[in-house]
Amino acid sequence: MNVATAASPKNQKSRILIADDNGPNVELLEAFLADVDCDIEIAVDGRDTLDKVAKFKPDLILLDIMMPKLSGFEVCKKLKDDPATSGIMILMVTALNELGDIERAVDAGTDDFLSKPVNKVELIKRVDNMLKLRHVTDELERLRRYIQGMED
């Protein structure tokens, strides 16, 4: 089953942004997502991530915490504080796995947290669940606007 297409409306490909400054980590995540029918874009630092979000409009971001220019915590907070980007699902994928790091990630607004080294099966399951949630949320919002329009 191709995960992202099954989760997306009208069989549109889901869009995933991988934000990590470490080339081998990016290559590993791309390889793990090879069987997922999705479009992938790469960002190499925090500022690049914000720029790519504006252009690529991802459904999901796999976000490293320790990046140059802006940390993953800062990027996540900026995205979740902005109504235009707050609905983007964020999965922090990081070597930081202390309780304090997880708390900071949650405080910044992350939707989920995955510690490195990443297990392929776990990553795919989380990506699948997050994309399904994103698309269901989008559909609920579309229906809410439709019903509201009927009442006006």
Regions found by a protein language model. Give the residues of each.
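Non-catalytic signal-transmission and effector/linker regions of two-component phosphorelay proteins
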Residues: 1-17, 30, 142-152
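Active-site beta3 strand of CheY-like receiver
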Residues: 56-62
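Two-component/phosphorelay signaling modules centered on CheY-like receiver
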Residues: 23-44
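Receiver (REC) domain active-site loop signature in two-component systems and cognate sites
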Residues: 67, 90
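C-terminal output helix
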Residues: 100, 118-127, 131
